[in-house]
Amino acid sequence: MDKRIIVALDVKEKKKAIDIAESLSDIVFAFKINWPLVLYSSPEVIGEISQYGKVICDFKVADIPYTNSLITERVRDLGAWGIISHSFLGEESLKSVVNAAKGMHVFSVVAMSHPGSDMINSNAMQLMKLSIECGVYGFVAPANKIDDLRMIRSATDRVIISPGIGAQGGDPYTAVLNGSDYLIVGRSVYESDKPELEVSKLQQTAERAIEDRERLKNS
């Protein structure tokens, strides 16, 4: 069974991030890093983490096309496997990310997991249509807002990665059953006394949900 867990390294200490990545390298699908880790260390941390697995840079790129291109090119050159971009800025801005990626996987945010995200989430279908036209690899959709997740899954067969598990209240089984392909989990893993065990439990839950999802689809 494919690995289904993406660990969010939402820490600011480079050594801690690298230690976590090294310990989990064999059992996760990818590592997601955000601006705090880069700003507190250096951009080169992208390449350092990528020695232990795929790195998705959650930079939620959201600027004019030229600036987006510069950000994406640098992330690609540093060795990232994927990058997350906002889609609400429109076609030209999102296309600039896709074009600059040149093989790096682009994930488009079409719905978010935090309170107050209704302005974006209510436009999820329009943002998804735009993102598909721009050629993104996959989508970011919330594990803790099942109606939004289910709606997005019903309209696409592209990859969906989902934050909102654990601290934000999302249930891993329910999220995968309703369309998530990969679960993004942070604090509940790296703050655990046994992070490897936590990832293994989440992986088993995801596998069970995938099996049930396929069974329901074929029934």
UniProtKB/Swiss-Prot annotation:
Catalytic site: K60 (proton donor)
Alphabetical list of CDD domains matching this protein: OMP_decarboxylase_like
Positions that bind substrate: 10, 32, 58-67, 113, 163-173, 186-187
Top-level EC class: lyase
Keyword set, alphabetical order: Decarboxylase, Lyase, Pyrimidine biosynthesis
InterPro entries: Aldolase_TIM (IPR013785), OMPdecase (IPR014732), OMPdecase_arc (IPR047595), OMPdecase_AS (IPR018089), OMPdeCOase_dom (IPR001754), RibuloseP-bd_barrel (IPR011060)
UniProt KW Cell membrane keyword: no
EC number: 4.1.1.23
Pathway(s) per entry: Pyrimidine metabolism; UMP biosynthesis via de novo pathway; UMP from orotate: step 2/2
Catalytic activity: orotidine 5'-phosphate + H(+) = UMP + CO2
Disulfide pattern: none
Pfam families: OMPdecase (PF00215)
Role summary: Catalyzes the decarboxylation of orotidine 5'-monophosphate (OMP) to uridine 5'-monophosphate (UMP).
Oligomer status and interactors: Homodimer.
Protein's name according to its UniProt entry: Orotidine 5'-phosphate decarboxylase
Organism listed in the record: Thermoplasma volcanium (strain ATCC 51530 / DSM 4299 / JCM 9571 / NBRC 15438 / GSS1)
Classification lineage: Archaea, Methanobacteriati, Thermoplasmatota, Thermoplasmata, Thermoplasmatales
